[in-house]
Amino acid sequence: MINKTLLGLSLGALMFTAGSAVAADYKIDKEGQHAFIEFRIKHLGYSWLYGSFNDFDGSFTFDDKNPAADKVNVVINTNSVDTNHAERDKHLRGKSFLNVAKFPQATFESTEVKKNGDGYSVIGNLTLNGVTKPVTLESKLTGQGNDPWGGYRAGFEANGNIKLKDFNITTDLGPASQEVELILSVEGVQVK
């Protein structure tokens, strides 16, 4: 009888421990301005021009003990590009750049997540301007824990670089402006 009880307790403890290490799904919290997708590019090599995409949605799966189980999916409405300059934004939405009339969305879907020191390398496919290319985002967990509303949250920062010509954006902006740095800060609410 004691052996059956010990076996039952051991199996129960094992199941509880295994369950707590399972990857959790999160919805990116953009409603409360807790997530940002920004970019910067050199302006003629003299200064940085910053912008953002204000309309996007996404989710991620996170297991800090098993990064191979992690996933990231983001959909960006490219019409929401915002550089704090209406005329430039109109130009960026046009055929020479984002061509939002033909390609209203950009997407990122991870294919692999690897632990990299105290952060993660998130490798995936970015589709922009009708072209899909592999991109690596270097990411760090900024924090995780319970929120005051009974939920659980996890936040990350990530950045990576893309070459404009890789995505059929061939407008000549000069030699110092061939790459765009992507800068992401996201907070996700665990899906129950």
Swiss-Prot record:
Family matches, as Gene3D superfamilies: Lipid/polyisoprenoid-binding, YceI-like
UniProt GO cellular component terms: extracellular space; periplasmic space
Source organism superkingdom: Bacteria
Alphabetical keyword list: Periplasm, Signal
Main location: periplasm
HAMAP family: UPF0312 (MF_00780)
NCBIfam families listed in its UniProt record: PRK03757.1
Protein name: UPF0312 protein YPO2315/YP_2102
Organism of origin: Yersinia pestis
